[in-house]
Regions:
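N-terminal "arm"/small-domain region of PLP-dependent enzymes with the aminotransferase-like
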Residues: 1-66, 472-474
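Conserved PLP-enzyme active-site core in the AAT-like
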Residues: 10-18, 22, 42, 81, ...
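Conserved N-terminal alpha-helix of the aminotransferase class I/II PLP-enzyme fold
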Residues: 47-90, 114
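Short glycine-rich or small-residue beta-strand-to-loop segments that form or flank ligand, phosphate
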Residues: 58, 85-87, 177-180, 337, ...
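A short linear hydrophobic-aromatic micro-motif
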Residues: 83-85, 236, 358-362
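Conserved C-terminal alpha-helix-loop-beta "cap" of PLP-dependent enzymes
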Residues: 319-483, 488, 492-502
């Protein structure tokens, strides 16, 4: 691989690929787009021009020794990791590799119930047994997470730390503790007491930090990173919040974990080769290199401060029916969560209304809009968002209602009931679970939802889930393969889908089968 000295270059991988693209070389190798030359302009002049394959003049993204390795080392230095690995196949693959690095097949793990569906898939592939930490719904307005009188910034349940500590103490055979933080609403639920208790028992702590890739850029503004809290391995989705191509992601291993487990670095590289494509994308890898360099720049810090100013501006400009929910000390201040509970809009009405006005948002639940501003989002976009919400408010038949009646309506209405049901499902007691067998049976299942509801059955009759039930976004499983679900809950899911919640189809099997 390339042994040219890129060690002093701020973006070694990006620069090496750019040098190759500018060299005028003749390509008789894959990919068939000839380094992007086969594409029409402007596509050919963009990142597609960095398309390449593993050559002597660049590097191997799965086993780097040249510019790609230098780029990973620069990422590790910036993020505070002992080792960082680039993934061009997304955080799902990085999560598979993280678990395979830390755990033997068949291991028992304790995990937050608010994990991404990728963990359920990884548990099936690695035959892991999952033990779920007890969850609870925080009191409204507690810990800066909500505004008076009631709405929480994040409706997701949080870990019940006292009960979780007891579970760690009494559960035998645990091999790891797994968190997901921050969540889709930007809230970090990573109790330090649990992390320390896990380390005291010799357990590695793993974290899906997909939404926290920007935190290292301004430690005085953002919550502490997972690595800074003492997490041993974590995955970040660079493409979610940074200027990187989708699905660019990173896997970090901490210094302390590598001291305790020197073989982990080798295992991580081997796990990446096991799960990632053998043709990783050079443009995506280069964008990871660029994103890290951008986070290190003075320009990035200036953009972050500007973004905070833009959010303050938006808070002042929104119509009365909408409110930017304040960020507490454990919330991402750049994650824009807007309450719409007193607006009178349904989820579908608000999503389609904004779309019709040219505003595309990340997610809407039954009471909130969730927006992910890019680090360089201009003030004009916030002005346009405010104008769109004002226009919708004026056009809506419920315009002019006072705030209190709106809140009361929300408290008594279907949106509040929907939120309560989702919280109840995530907080329910759950048995130890090995989802592998049910997951692979589900590939052949002929019973699906909602089709199964056309059959006769009692409301309390149970069926076994054989594929993940996870509204998307945010992709948090309500049921995992191997768990039982009643027809009553299946019907309730159908109601929620009719109200605007996107629930991908899933498979089931009858308990008699």
């Amino acid at each position: 691989m390339n042994h040219e000295d890129f060690s002093t270059v701020s973006t070694p991988l990006f620069s090496a690929l750019q040098k190759e693209a500018d060299s005028g070389r003749t390509s008789f190798h894959m990919p068939g787009n000839r380094g992007g030359k086969a594409f029409p302009s402007p596509f050919s002049s963009g990142f597609a021009g960095l398309e390449s394959t593993e050559l002597e003049i660049n590097d191997d993204l799965n086993e780097p020794t040249g510019p790609a390795l230098l780029a990973e080392e620069k990422a590790a230095a910036f993020f505070g990791a002992g080792k960082s690995l680039f993934f061009t196949s997304g955080s799902t693959v990085a999560i598979y590799a993280m678990l395979a690095t830390a755990l033997q097949p068949g291991s028992r793990v304790a995990a937050s119930a608010a994990l991404h569906r990728a963990f359920a898939q990884a548990a099936a592939l690695l035959d892991l047994e999952m033990v779920f930490l007890p969850m609870t719904v925080p009191k409204r307005g507690a810990d800066g997470r909500g505004d008076s009188p009631s709405l929480l910034r994040s409706p997701l349940p949080v870990i019940d730390t006292p009960r979780a500590l007891k579970l760690l103490e009494k559960t035998e055979g645990l091999r790891a503790l797994i968190f997901s933080a921050p969540d889709y609403y930007g809230h970090v639920d990573l109790p330090q007491e649990l992390l320390e208790a896990a380390h005291a028992r010799g357990l590695p702590v793993l974290c899906d930090e997909a939404h926290g890739a920007a935190f290292a850029a301004a430690v005085e503004i953002f919550p502490k990173t997972a690595l800074a809290r003492g997490v041993d391995l974590c995955v970040q989705s660079a493409h979610k919040t940074l200027p990187a191509l989708a699905p660019a992601s990173l896997l970090h291993l901490s210094h302390s974990y590598l001291r305790r487990c020197p073989e982990a670095a080798r295992r991580a590289v081997a796990a990446r080769k096991l799960f990632q494509t053998s043709s990783p994308s050079f443009p995506i890898g280069a964008s990871l290199d660029f994103a890290r360099a951008y986070l290190e720049s003075a320009e990035c810090r200036e953009k972050i401060q500007l973004l905070l100013d833009h959010i303050t501006f938006l808070r002042q400009e929104l119509p009365p029916a909408f409110q930017v929910l304040p960020a507490g000390p454990e919330d991402d201040p750049l994650r824009l969560v807007i309450s719409c509970r007193s607006s009178g809009f349904s989820l579908r009405e608000l999503s389609s209304g904004l779309s019709s006005l040219g505003i595309d948002i990340e997610m809407a639940d039954f009471s909130r809009l969730v927006l992910i501003p890019s680090l360089d989002q201009p003030r004009e976009d916030f002005m346009r968002l405010s104008a769109a919400l004002r226009k919708l408010s004026l056009e809506h038949k419920g315009v002019g209602r006072a705030e209190k009646p709106g809140v009361a309506c929300w408290e008594e209405g279907s949106a509040a009931r929907a939120e309560e049901d989702l919280q109840r499902w995530l907080c329910r007691p759950r048995a130890f679970l090995k989802p592998r067998a049910a997951t692979f049976r589900g590939l052949f299942s002929k019973v699906d939802w909602p089709g199964v509801l056309s059959e006769q059955g009692e409301g309390d009759e149970s069926l076994r889930v054989t594929s993940v039930i996870a509204p998307y976004p945010p992709g948090i499983p309500l049921w995992l393969p191997g768990e039982e679900i009643t027809r009553r809950d299946l019907l309730r899911l159908l109601d929620l889908q009719a109200e605007g919640l996107h629930i991908p189809p899933f498979t089931l099997e009858k308990l008699s089968e």
